[in-house]
Amino acid sequence: MSIRLEQIISENLERLPNEPFLCWQKTWWSRGAFLELVKECEERLVESRFKPGQKIALLLPNSPISLALTVAIWKLQGTVVPIDYRGAYITLIKQLVHADVFAAITFMGCENIAPLISEEGIPCYITSLVAPGDPIAGRAALKETADNAVIFYTSGTTGESKAVALSHSNLLSVTESCIEHLGDISEDDILLNALPNFNALGFVSGSLISLVKALPQVTLQSFMPAKTTWNIVKQNNVTIIPAVPTMIALLLGAAGQGLDRTSSLKYILSGGDKLPENYIKRCTEILGVPIIEGYGLTEASSVVSLAPGIDGIKPGKLGTLLSCVESKICDDTGAVLPPGKEGKLWIRGESVASSYYRNSELTERYFVDGWFDTSDIAKFDEEGFLSLVGRTTDVIFVGGFKVYAGEVEMVISEHPAVAEVSVIGVPRSISGEIVKAFIVLKEGEKITSKELIEICKKKLSYYKVPRIIEFVEKLPTRKIW
């Protein structure tokens, strides 16, 4: 039997139980106190008759309870399904139904959606962020393999939300490979857990590395405001900040409000979106810390490549492959290309999923002969450093989140007043890009941009909603900024 995550986590945290492990709202929890919370969560789930192979959806922010429930579910041989609780209601329901969960657990910040979810036949319960609630009456959900640790929902290589099931071995291999690749992570480090854990990158870099290595973490429900977060980093001697470029931009912006440097911070880990090259220089000059950039996908347990430590940073490059990943660059015929040549990036390895969860059509399309088609155009230099050239799919990156133009266009085109629509990304310094829609109305029809935006808000996640709508007589044949 392969080693499971909860075994390693429990063994490491049980050593030196009085050592600090988790800081939440200015209070440090010891390893022992956190394990006691895990035990309480496990007892509640046993009382709820939760069975091995079943799944529980967590609609929770980063918090002690989200971490403890995750470990408790694993201890009972179950699967965690983190859901973006900020997403559109219709998307939440689709994901919960698709995953066939035993129950959903959320918090007071989302108490308005709990009864709506329950009305769809999925029991939804409210918990505090520091203690488990009462036993829950789950549904007779499908029981599957206990090997699946987490099921993430991602836009991935198409605009439609789909599920990626990652096993314990997938996540353990990427966690250990990241630690090995960076080379200087020790028990003296303190991580900032501020990236949303319903995202694979946040889950691995913010939570899992800390849990597996028993590294102290400062857990934040929200990264905002950035100035407050920076002060928390200083006060708690945080050494590593996992982030997306939007978060880095916000920190740099807050620096104009008079941020003092912190001597404890070693570096910022950046992923989830392309990092503007000037950020590296500005971060060193203004905040006094380097940025270690990487590349990854949910299908590869969030990380494929990383700069090999501070000395291995090469501006414009996305580091070298982790030891758990193999890759090849291929042309349109499938022929493997040498270093320096651009082509489609394929990957495989211990950290790469074997399929899309309950989606045989997409599995057949993107998982071919043991390799995963990333749909990214890339190249490696002679030293093995990765560069992304472009994407084979039309993707807009908003604050580290993928937005597919076709998905937004489909929602807008459903309105009877709309004849044609084209959606693009418009560059913005903070979010990377924002969504803009060009719309041709049918003759004699009228609708305002405000009305269309309100329609989009009801059907799309917040980051997919167009910020700009321009009515035109004819669609542009090229991108207009």
Predicted regions and their residues:
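Gly/Ser/Thr-rich phosphate-binding loop
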Residues: 238-243, 252-313, 326
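AMP-binding/adenylate-forming catalytic core of the ANL superfamily
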Residues: 87, 349, 354-355, 377-464, ...
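Conserved pre-ATP/AMP-binding loop-to-beta segment of ANL
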Residues: 2, 18-20, 135-153, 159-160, ...
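Structural core segment of the AMP-binding/adenylate-forming
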Residues: 45-48, 71, 75-142, 443-445, ...
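Conserved AMP-binding/adenylate-forming core of the ANL superfamily
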Residues: 18-63, 67-71, 88-93, 169
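Conserved ATP/PPi-binding loop(s) of AMP-dependent carboxylate-activating enzymes
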Residues: 320-324, 335-366, 403
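Conserved AMP-binding/adenylation subdomain of ANL enzymes
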Residues: 172-190, 200-240, 254
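Conserved AMP-binding A3 loop
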Residues: 30-32, 149-176
